[in-house]
């Protein structure tokens, strides 16, 4: 999702913005994530409360992908130049915190107990694009 004046962006908005400006970007190809649309996360949390559930529930997007794949898909979705995306390994980054290679979750409990149905990555991009239009 989009929040005006965020102190920190997310990978989708960062990649979109950089590619729109024609900036060459370095993107790790050895880390995997389940991108999560903020409204899906909020709906999942609300469902826990409404269904009076407790315990551990994994809530995330339903698509697991590498960060480089995510950025390529952003470029494809918005019709941006993928040739300026440079795949790199995590080891060459001097990240302040070590990142795990995989952070995907098993959503089966949330789907069964909460009727959790997160958007696909492209559905999330559709929703994000509508938010961006509304803000401008």
Predicted regions and their residues:
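Amphipathic alpha-helical segments that line or abut small-molecule/effector binding pockets
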Residues: 39-47, 122, 126
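Conserved C-terminal active-site "lid" loop/helix of NAD(P)H-dependent oxidoreductases
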Residues: 66-72, 89-128, 132-136
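NAD(P)-dependent short-chain dehydrogenase/reductase
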Residues: 1-33, 39-40
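Residue-level signal for alpha-helix termini/capping positions
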Residues: 19-20, 49-50, 133
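Glycine-rich Rossmann NAD(P)(H)-binding loop
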Residues: 27-32, 57-65, 113
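Mid/C-terminal beta-alpha module of Rossmann-like enzyme folds, strongest
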Residues: 44, 51-96, 136
